[in-house]
């Protein structure tokens, strides 16, 4: 297998923070707390943790194995390891998924900038609950403002990716991730100090095993899979920048712990604040852009400055979570174009950003001015459906089958143990999960996401 000279992360902490940044995203904040609170609290969290460490980490290690062994972008890595370019279809699925996800995810990321501005200008003050609904609908359906924020947001991942692995991705991760941690801890402490916050803590953390059933188990598996950025090529691309001393198992464990830490702390922000004013939180964009602005104003309404600061910090937190995810998605496609077509990183990044501008504009317009339907879905929802419900589970499944069944066990063992320098007594269990449990789990996630088990 021919390997090319390749950039690498300059430190182990840089590699861990970059990989964790890929995993931490908006889903940690707008989906996990809702799922946990409504499906058994601590019982769901325990189930989720089991799914992360039993299913998620082995798949993550498998992606790390492919990337570091091949020392190539995900679009080329599988073919290089198999000595057969036909296997590149697995990596290309991740490249295409990353490109399409960027097209609509960046739109939502741009919304966070609008809400940062609204926080700074005290635009949420003196509004009634129904005003937040009208304001969000008016903004998201506007043909101009969301597009302006989309373009503004895309500048940041583009600039960071152009700067390269060490000076761009690693350096930014060492800044963005600690700031994100500080913000989420400060916001959680402030939220838990509110009156009646204990009701929110009880809702999130009190175990209710009576709510745990097959549907909740499938939901926990799905949340673990999507939260860790599996199946989209980000982790294998980043792993291609790992040095030979990086311990894949330890790195995967660190990423899993950080991702879960952020998700739980997001719940400690949302539920105490919501219950302090008697509001039942929902999930998704409506939670972030309708419910929470209302919650923050009511919770701190007696002190407008505090309401403004809390809201500002929260939307900065959201923007950072979105940015770390989009950097990794952008890098997946940029690295592939750079290697496959021998073009400069700058030109490759320009092509990716240009595509994101086009698909982002179409995604944004499909929420309002452009009402065209594809299979009964608007363009934004179509991209979300095709990537989240089809491409990512399929990509994760193919990674499991490739590493579990096709790739030589000796290759997996060498990568996991750094050629025998580290011990890996769990290797047989890891291979069993990768061969049998993980594929079955992903198939169940796939059919559940499509609603076939309902």
Q: Which ranges hold each PLM region?
A:
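Helix-loop-helix connectors at the membrane interface of multi-pass transporters/channels
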Residues: 1-2, 6, 109-141, 241-245, ...
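Transmembrane helix-boundary motif of multi-pass solute transporters/channels
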Residues: 11-49, 199, 236-239, 250-253, ...
């Amino acid at each position: 297998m021919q390997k090319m000279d390749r950039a690498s992360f300059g430190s182990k902490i840089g590699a861990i923070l970059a990989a964790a940044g890929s995993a931490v995203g908006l889903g940690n904040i707008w989906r996990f707390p809702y799922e946990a609170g409504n499906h058994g609290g601590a019982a769901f969290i325990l189930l989720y943790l089991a799914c992360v460490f039993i299913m998620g980490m082995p798949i993550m290690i498998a992606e790390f194995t492919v990337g570091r062994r091949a020392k190539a972008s995900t679009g080329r890595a599988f073919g290089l390891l198999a000595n057969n370019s036909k296997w590149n279809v697995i990596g290309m699925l991740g490249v295409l998924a990353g490109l399409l996800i960027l097209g609509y995810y960046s739109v939502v990321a741009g919304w966070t900038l609008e809400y940062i501005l609204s926080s700074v200008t005290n635009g949420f003050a003196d509004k009634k609950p129904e005003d937040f609904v009208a304001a969000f609908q008016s903004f998201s359906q506007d043909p101009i403002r969301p597009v302006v924020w989309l373009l503004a947001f895309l500048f940041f991942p583009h600039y960071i990716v152009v700067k390269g692995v060490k000076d761009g991705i690693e350096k930014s991760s060492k800044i963005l991730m600690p700031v994100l941690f500080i913000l989420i801890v400060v916001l959680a402490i402030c939220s838990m100090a509110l009156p009646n916050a204990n009701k929110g803590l009880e809702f999130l953390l009190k175990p209710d095993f009576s709510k745990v059933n097959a549907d909740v188990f499938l939901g926990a598996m799905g949340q673990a899979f999507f939260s860790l950025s599996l199946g989209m090529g980000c982790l294998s691309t980043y792993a291609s920048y790992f040095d030979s001393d990086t311990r894949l198992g330890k790195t995967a464990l660190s990423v899993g712990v950080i991702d879960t830490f952020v998700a739980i702390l997001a719940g400690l922000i949302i539920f105490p604040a919501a219950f302090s004013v008697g509001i039942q939180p929902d999930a998704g964009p409506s939670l972030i852009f309708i419910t929470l602005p209302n919650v923050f104003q009511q919770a701190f309404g007696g002190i407008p400055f505090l309401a403004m600061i809390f809201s500002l910090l929260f939307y900065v937190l959201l923007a950072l979570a979105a940015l770390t995810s989009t950097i990794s998605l952008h890098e997946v496609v940029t690295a592939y174009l750079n290697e496959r077509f021998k073009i400069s990183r700058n030109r490759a990044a320009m092509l990716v950003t240009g595509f994101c501008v086009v698909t982002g504009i179409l995604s944004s317009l499909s929420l309002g001015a452009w009402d065209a339907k594809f299979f009964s879905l608007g363009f934004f929802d179509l991209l979300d459906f095709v990537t989240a419900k089809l491409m990512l589970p399929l990509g994760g499944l193919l990674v499991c089958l490739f590493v579990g069944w096709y790739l030589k066990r000796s290759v997996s063992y060498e990568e996991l143990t750094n050629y025998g320098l580290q011990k890996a007594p769990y290797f047989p269990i890891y291979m069993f999960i990768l061969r049998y449990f993980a594929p079955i789990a992903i198939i169940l996630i796939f059919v559940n996401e499509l609603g076939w088990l309902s």
